């Protein structure tokens, strides 16, 4: 092993850390830097006693001051031939991380790194020379920087469930690596009620300028000045000091449709939040105070990434109850209307994609069921009707027939033209018919 160590010093000039991590799986309770220095000290004492000046020069070149001290003309220390001096700068890298994270609120973090092939090749050749299988530089660097950041910020590293991931990328440059901070998003779930018509669910970019701003949109970049997403998101974004947000909901209602009752499930994803511990009851109250005439939220609670998929799935399996204000082309006898509505219950509707959404939906026939159809108010040529429908059934076209694209329709069955003047979603139910 002594000859192997001399050969390793000659070929690779390893720093204490790189030499130590070659034996990183031997003994516990020692840092690799301590292991490497201990090996060099042993070699130095042996070489000094036996008068091996060449070995002492190799050790001095690798940074062992004790070896340099006994030489008349010691060589200057040179950078490590394996890590190229990177592992001597872990304190500096830890300071960079601490400076970047000091204003962020988080419970745990993890340090990661990416390395060029030349470094991995050099360490492998060092291990082959020594006849050992050592600890990779990636693991050493990540651990040592992490330990120092823990001390600097008084926080703990948490590789399994970190709020923050810090990544150094040494592939472009060992001297000036790229540095990335990935902050785990915050997920807030709940339900929203839209109390005023004319508000889209999500931000609607101007179709002429595609969000850039033009006279058509009064240079806002938006077709509508506000949306459910923005009204809720602006309060949550400020509360968590987030850079931006994404809105995920269980389906959507038309702009001119209100969302009432128990509300529509949603998840707000807050990106790069500087705060993580916020009282959601207080935020719920703040949202309802600020925008409650238009939009309200209920049941806000912390969620997780899986909730995004769940809320999307919910839109595919959840029935909705609607209240529709219907205008007929001429008065329809009440008994006939009640008979038609009774016949609609449990009916399967064949509905070709409505003309009004053909620009954004595939033109195909969907088969959906009407589970309930009840007359609430009647006044000759007007009526208020409640429908309980499968997800994805277009209620406006169920009423009008959409020029024969929806069959059967209310208009077809009463043999009078019919249109939906107003529409509300009044209940959001799960796939079993219970409230979600």
From Swiss-Prot:
EC number: 5.4.99.25
Pfam families referenced in this protein's UniProt entry, alphabetically: Pus10_C, Pus10_THUMP_arc
Enzyme class: isomerase
Superkingdom of source: Archaea
Keyword RNA-binding: yes
Catalyses which reaction(s): uridine(54) in tRNA = pseudouridine(54) in tRNA; uridine(55) in tRNA = pseudouridine(55) in tRNA
Protein's UniProt keywords contain Transport: no
SUPFAM superfamilies: Pseudouridine synthase
GO-annotated molecular function: tRNA binding; tRNA pseudouridine(55) synthase activity
HAMAP family: Pus10_arch
Function: Responsible for synthesis of pseudouridine from uracil-54 and uracil-55 in the psi GC loop of transfer RNAs.
Protein family according to the UniProt entry: Belongs to the pseudouridine synthase Pus10 family.
Protein name as it appears in the record: tRNA pseudouridine synthase Pus10
Organism: Methanopyrus kandleri (strain AV19 / DSM 6324 / JCM 9639 / NBRC 100938)
Designated gene of the protein: pus10
């Amino acid at each position: 092993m002594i000859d192997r160590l001399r050969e390793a010093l000659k070929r690779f000039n390893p720093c204490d850390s790189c030499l130590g991590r070659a034996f990183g799986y031997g003994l516990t309770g020692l840092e690799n830097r301590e292991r490497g220095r201990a090996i060099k000290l042993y070699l130095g004492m042996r070489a000094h006693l036996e008068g091996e000046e060449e070995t002492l020069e190799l050790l001095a070149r690798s940074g062992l001051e004790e070896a340099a001290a006994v030489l008349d003309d010691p060589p200057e220390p040179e950078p490590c031939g394996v890590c190229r001096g990177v592992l001597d700068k872990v304190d500096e890298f830890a300071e960079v991380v601490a400076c970047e994270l000091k204003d962020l609120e988080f419970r745990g973090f993890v340090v990661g790194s990416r390395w060029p092939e030349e470094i991995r090749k050099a360490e492998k050749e060092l291990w082959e020379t020594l006849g050992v299988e050592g600890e990779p530089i990636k693991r050493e660097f990540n651990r040592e920087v992490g330990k120092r950041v823990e001390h600097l910020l008084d926080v703990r590293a948490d590789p399994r469930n970190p709020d923050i991931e810090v990544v150094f990328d040494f592939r472009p440059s060992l001297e000036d690596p790229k540095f990335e901070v990935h902050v785990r998003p915050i997920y807030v779930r709940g339900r929203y009620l839209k109390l005023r018509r004319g508000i889209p669910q999500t931000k609607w970019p101007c179709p002429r300028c595609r969000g850039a701003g033009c006279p058509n949109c009064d240079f806002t970049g938006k077709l509508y000045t506000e949306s459910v997403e923005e009204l809720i998101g602006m309060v949550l974004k400020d509360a968590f000091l987030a850079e931006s947000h994404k809105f995920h909901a269980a389906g959507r209602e038309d702009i001119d449709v209100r969302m009432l009752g128990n509300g529509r499930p949603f998840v707000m994803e807050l990106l790069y939040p500087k705060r993580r511990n916020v009282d959601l009851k207080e935020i719920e109250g703040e949202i309802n105070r600020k925008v409650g005439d238009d939009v309200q939220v209920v049941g806000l609670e912390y969620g997780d990434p899986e909730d995004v998929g769940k809320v999307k799935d919910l839109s595919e399996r959840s029935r909705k109850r609607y209240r529709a204000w219907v205008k007929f082309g001429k008065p329809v006898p009440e008994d006939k209307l009640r008979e038609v509505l009774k016949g609609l219950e449990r009916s399967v509707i064949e509905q070709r994609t409505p003309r009004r959404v053909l620009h954004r939906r595939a033109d195909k026939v969907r088969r959906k069921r009407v589970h309930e159809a009840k007359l609430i108010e009647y006044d000759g040529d007007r009526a208020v009707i409640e429908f309980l429908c499968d997800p994805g059934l277009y209620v406006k076209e169920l009423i009008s027939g959409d020029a024969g694209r929806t069959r059967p329709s209310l208009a077809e069955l009463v043999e009078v033209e019919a249109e939906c003047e107003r529409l509300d979603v009044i209940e959001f139910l799960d796939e079993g018919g219970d409230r979600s």
